[in-house]
């Protein structure tokens, strides 16, 4: 299959050295000025990220509290209770679909919500390691390019290699990856909306041990189907296929019992659809396993808290990096004097750290101001602590 492509008999590598004149002071200053604009954009973006994150977190927390106070659990999932029409309901049950999902090309058939075919091709992959050094007034860059063969699920474009000759990859795969999804999914009498079906993503590898080779030119080894003359010694261009599934929808002697999920959504007839809260958010929750309504909302609150802190950290980091880029020009102005340069670098980083911390806390306080003014005032006071510490250290250094 790989006769038209490069041999994979050995790993190959080569080294390339490039050089350019050492940049002068004005050139470095010009590059730093460009970085200031990028830093300013990053700095401003961080305010938007932090502020909107607080609004999102509070809206989500309010919606979850509202949902917990309103949710009801039907007596049975096998009948539709008219009194729950339009209400937020808590449903627990095994998934069920109307027909099998299949890939007839490989003889795969099973009851599931989703069936994924994952395709990989054996290809050349280029890796590079670079190092820079100064020699005779020149900045030299030494790059070592290494070529190895690996199974990859995406096409690796060998035209972008530093040296394509001897490392050529096919431009397309003979087989494509895809995911089949059941059109109708039920829990008892209730049909899941598309949004709930999308949340069923707990994919598990499908064992191919009991399947036969579907064609003469396809060989099964372990949990892969190989389009190869010899799977033990693949060549560039060879393809292997594996399968995974999510949401087993019927008891199976090999795969186990049907998958059980817990859903919290709005009941509309026999449909489970998104529920709109008073705060303008929507509730459409699916958890894998059997959970009470209280457990589901507790898990969602924990997830919301983790996401909030993660975005706060990302906002702080963006602000810190933006300030570093904006103040980099001061470092460039003194980089000709090694000792003073290092002191300035430490001072600028400390300045960026203090300012980023203070502004992050103030932005968080502004986000909370409308909803929780007392907490906002407390955070605002904490935000002043780094600035006060920084200011009290300055006179001390002058006295030294």
UniProtKB/Swiss-Prot annotation:
Quaternary structure? Answer: Can form oligomers through the transmembrane domains. Interacts with EMD; the interaction retains EMD at the inner nuclear membrane. Interacts with LMNA and LMNB2. Interacts with SUN2. Interacts with RNF26; this interaction is important to modulate innate immune signaling through the cGAS-STING pathway. Interacts with CARD10. Interacts with gap junctions proteins GJB2/Cx26 and GJB4/Cx30.
Q: Which keywords are on file for this protein? A: Acetylation, Cell membrane, Endoplasmic reticulum, Immunity, Innate immunity, Membrane, Nucleus, Transmembrane, Transmembrane helix
Entry annotated with the keyword DNA-binding: no
Those parts of the protein on the Nuclear side are 2-31, 335-345, 390-400
> Under what name is this protein listed?
Transmembrane protein 43
**What does the similarity note say?**
Belongs to the TMEM43 family.
| Organism listed in the record | Mus musculus
User: Which residue spans belong to the Perinuclear space compartment?
Assistant: 53-313, 367-368
Where exactly are the transmembrane stretches of this chain? 32-52, 314-334, 346-366, 369-389
Q: Name one GO cellular component term.
A: Golgi apparatus
Q: Where the protein is mainly located, per its record?
A: endoplasmic reticulum
Places the protein is found: Endoplasmic reticulum membrane; Nucleus inner membrane; Cell membrane
Its job:
May have an important role in maintaining nuclear envelope structure by organizing protein complexes at the inner nuclear membrane. Required for retaining emerin at the inner nuclear membrane. Plays a role in the modulation of innate immune signaling through the cGAS-STING pathway by interacting with RNF26. In addition, functions as a critical signaling component in mediating NF-kappa-B activation by acting downstream of EGFR and upstream of CARD10. Contributes to passive conductance current in cochlear glia-like supporting cells, mediated by gap junctions and necessary for hearing.
- Tissue-by-tissue expression: Widely expressed, including in the cochlea, heart, eye, brain and kidney.
| Residues modified as N-acetylalanine | 2
Q: How does it sit in the membrane?
A: Multi-pass membrane protein
Signal peptide: which range, if any?
none
Instruction: Please give one Gene Ontology molecular function term for this protein.
Output: identical protein binding
């Amino acid at each position: 299959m790989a006769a038209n492509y490069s041999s994979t008999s050995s790993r190959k590598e080569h080294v390339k050295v490039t050089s350019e004149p050492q940049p002068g002071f004005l050139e470095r200053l010009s590059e730093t000025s460009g970085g200031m604009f990028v830093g300013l954009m990053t700095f401003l973006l961080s305010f938007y990220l932090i502020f909107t994150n607080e609004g999102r977190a509070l809206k989500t927390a309010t919606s979850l509290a509202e949902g917990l106070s309103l949710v009801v659990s039907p007596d049975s999932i096998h009948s539709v209770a008219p009194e729950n029409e339009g209400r937020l309901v808590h449903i627990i049950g095994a998934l069920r679909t109307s027909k099998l999902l299949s890939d007839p090309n490989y003889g795969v058939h099973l009851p599931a919500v989703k069936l994924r075919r994952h395709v990989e091709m054996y290809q050349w992959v280029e890796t590079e390691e670079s190092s820079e050094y100064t020699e005779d007034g020149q900045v030299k860059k030494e790059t070592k390019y290494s070529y190895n063969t690996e199974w990859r699920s995406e096409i690796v474009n060998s035209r972008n290699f530093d040296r394509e000759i001897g490392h050529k990859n096919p431009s397309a795969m003979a087989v494509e990856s895809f995911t089949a999804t059941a059109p109708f999914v039920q829990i008892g009498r209730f049909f899941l909306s598309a949004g709930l079906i999308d949340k069923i993503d707990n994919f598990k590898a499908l064992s191919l041990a009991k399947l036969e080779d579907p064609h003469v030119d396809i060989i099964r080894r372990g949990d892969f189907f190989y389009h190869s003359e010899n799977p033990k010694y693949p060549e560039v261009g060879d393809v292997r296929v594996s399968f995974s599934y999510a949401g087993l929808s019927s008891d199976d002697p090999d795969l186990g019992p049907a998958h059980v999920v817990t859903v919290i959504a709005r009941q509309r007839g026999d449909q489970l659809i998104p529920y709109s809260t008073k705060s303008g958010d929507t509730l459409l929750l699916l958890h894998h396993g059997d959970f009470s309504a209280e457990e589901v909302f507790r898990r969602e609150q924990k997830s919301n808290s983790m996401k909030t802190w993660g975005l706060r950290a990302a906002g702080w980091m963006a602000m810190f990096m933006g300030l570093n880029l904006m103040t980099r020009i001061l470092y460039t102005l003194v980089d000709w004097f090694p000792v003073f340069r290092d002191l300035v670098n430490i001072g600028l980083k400390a300045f960026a750290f203090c300012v980023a911390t203070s502004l992050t806390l103030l932005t968080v306080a502004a986000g909370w101001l409308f909803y929780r003014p007392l907490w906002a005032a407390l955070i605002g006071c904490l935000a002043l602590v780094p600035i006060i510490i920084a200011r009290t250290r300055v006179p001390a250094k002058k006295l030294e």
